[in-house]
A protein has these predicted regions:
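Short N-terminal "domain-start" leader segments
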Residues: 1-36
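Short aromatic-glycine-(Arg/Gly/Cys) micro-motifs in beta-strand/loop hairpins
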Residues: 25-51, 66-67, 78
Length: 80
């Protein structure tokens, strides 16, 4: 599995609560030989916020991506 092969787009929609959110996860190489898990989240239609989590090894980065995806799935986010 290579970085960049597994971008995930998760959405959570609940019209009764006026909720329309997205969560995007991707693993990307950094300029210095490491890897970053890029998380972007917010309301659909906005730029959202972004956070980078840095890792020295691609397997650690991919494991972190899957851990976050599992947490979001438990909170009601679904893959798109």
């Amino acid at each position: 599995m290579e970085p960049g092969d597994t971008p995930l787009l998760l959405k959570r929609v609940d019209p009764a609560r006026n909720m329309n959110r997205f969560y995007h996860l991707s693993v990307e190489p950094t300029l210095f030989g490491g890897f970053a898990v890029r998380r972007t989240w917010g309301r659909v239609g906005t730029w959202g916020r972004t956070r980078l989590d840095l890792f020295a090894d691609v397997t650690l980065a991919l494991a972190h991506q899957q851990k976050i995806a599992a947490q979001k799935h438990r909170r009601g986010y679904c893959p798109q």
